[in-house]
Amino acid sequence: MLYIVGTPIGNLKDITYRAVEVLRSVDEIACEDTRHTLGLLNAYDIKKPLFACHKFNERAASEKIIEKLKEGKNIALVSDAGMPLISDPGCILVKELIANNLEYTVIPGASAFVCALIMSGLLDYRFSFVGFLPDKNSEC
């Protein structure tokens, strides 16, 4: 089973109890930056093998994850902050999971855009999220 796990977006204490339980229970963790994820895992005394899954190796990492899942391993996918797939790697992997009829689930976590909406004071019963602003090196 693949677990898509939400991680804190600033404060390491903002991780859910369920996310910590899953990270403790899986065989391996796929992450954007192993150094960054190691900091989170160390804060909760979690010792698991890590391997990179980022925008530069997502296709190869997805193939590796598929192989491990077919071997019966449980894998967690995390991003540096927030939810994988939301402006982070994971879309290729989920498409491959569906194509290979492999199970996955989402462990919710912190949400940057919901926090921003609430902090804005513009809260209403309707809102739309159309993505994050491009980074300073991107073309608009």
PLM features: what roles do these ranges have?
Residues 92-140:
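Class I SAM-dependent methyltransferase SAM-binding "motif I" and its flanking Rossmann-like core
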Residues 62-111:
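Glycine/small-residue-rich loop that forms an oxyanion/phosphate-binding "nest" at active or ligand-binding sites
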Residues 52-59, 132-137:
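Conserved helicase motor
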Residues 1-5, 71-79, 127:
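Generic beta-sheet signal
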Residues 39-40, 85, 114-116:
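Phosphate- and divalent-cation-binding pockets in alpha/beta enzyme and binding domains
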Residues 14, 56-63, 88, 124:
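Residues at secondary-structure transition points
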Residues 1-56:
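Glycine-rich, flexible N-terminal cofactor/catalytic loop recognition
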Residues 18-21, 43-46, 65-67, 89-94, ...:
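Short, glycine/charged-enriched secondary-structure capping and boundary segments
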